[in-house]
């Protein structure tokens, strides 16, 4: 009798295991389908829509104390007004950048359009200071912030976007015309305007900028203004029919 009960119990459990395996397979298929869909959507974003880098802020430690008055007197394109700002402001034409040089030996470089140019400019500033007579070293160069901008080519309904994404959105049109959108789990901040213009800031790499744009593009895609004629052509090209809110 015990062997019969065991066989019956085993027989009853077998279909449940097969169902669980089947469900697991279905879930994996769904995950793969979702991932492939996202990859396809990202590939369908035109290259010219991706953000162009507008400003890169980097820092470096020159590892020596600096006499800012001497630097301002002996270097070209340098100005120093300690009553206004406690740093020498120095400029380069190639690459077109501005450096803030502090007495502690810390330096901030702004205005470069690429990571390479930011590094190259910082090294040029360091050499200028070295030629003046300071024992400069080039240490701890780091990109602190990358700013990019783009135009998604369709107008956006900011009111509906703000209603559906309250956790991520700060929108006060009386104070600032754009919507401030903070990326979840990142430090990237997006300024989104009704015209479709977007500014992205807070990234450390170009890859961070592109990934943030890929995410926000498909969010904004669902908030196109309904009366935008160009959206229909865009939808046909992508073969996608999103829900559009007016």
Curated annotation (Swiss-Prot):
Residues 1-27 are annotated as: Disordered. InterPro entries: TBP (IPR000814), TBP_CS (IPR030491), TBP_dom_sf (IPR012295), TBP_eukaryotic (IPR033710). It is found in: Nucleus. Its main location: nucleus. One of its GO terms (molecular function) is DNA binding. Keywords: DNA-binding, Nucleus, Repeat, Transcription. One of its GO terms (cellular component) is nucleus. It comes from the Eukaryota. GO terms for biological process: DNA-templated transcription initiation. SUPFAM superfamilies: TATA-box binding protein-like. Sequence repeats lie at residues 53-129, 143-220. General transcription factor that functions at the core of the DNA-binding multiprotein factor TFIID. Binding of TFIID to the TATA box is the initial transcriptional step of the pre-initiation complex (PIC), playing a role in the activation of eukaryotic genes transcribed by RNA polymerase II. Belongs to the TFIID complex together with the TBP-associated factors (TAFs). Binds DNA as monomer. Belongs to the TBP family. This is TATA-box-binding protein.
């Amino acid at each position: 009798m015990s062997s019969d009960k065991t066989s019956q119990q085993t027989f009853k459990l077998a279909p449940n295991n097969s169902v669980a395996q089947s469900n697991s397979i279905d879930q994996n298929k769904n995950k793969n389908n979702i991932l492939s869909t996202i990859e396809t959507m990202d590939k369908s974003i035109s290259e010219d829509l991706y953000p162009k880098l507008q400003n890169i802020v980097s820092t470096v430690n020159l590892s020596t104390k600096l006499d800012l008055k001497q630097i301002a007197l002996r270097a070209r394109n340098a100005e120093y007004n300690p009553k206004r700002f406690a740093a020498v402001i120095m400029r380069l034409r190639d690459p077109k950048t501005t450096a803030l040089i502090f007495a502690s030996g810390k330096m901030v470089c702004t205005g470069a359009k690429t990571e390479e140019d930011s590094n190259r400019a910082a090294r040029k500033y360091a050499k200028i200071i070295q030629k003046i007579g300071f024992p400069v070293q080039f240490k701890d160069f780091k990109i602190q912030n990358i700013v990019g901008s783009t135009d998604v080519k369709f107008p956006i309904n900011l009111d509906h976007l703000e209603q559906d994404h309250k956790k991520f959105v700060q929108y006060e049109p009386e104070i600032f015309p754009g919507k401030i959108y903070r990326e979840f789990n990142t430090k990237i901040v997006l300024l989104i305007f009704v015209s479709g213009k977007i500014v992205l800031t807070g990234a450390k790499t170009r890859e961070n900028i592109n990934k943030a744009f890929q995410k926000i593009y498909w969010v904004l895609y669902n908030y196109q203004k309904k009366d935008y004629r160009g959206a229909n052509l865009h939808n046909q090209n992508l073969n996608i029919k999103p829900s559009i809110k007016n």
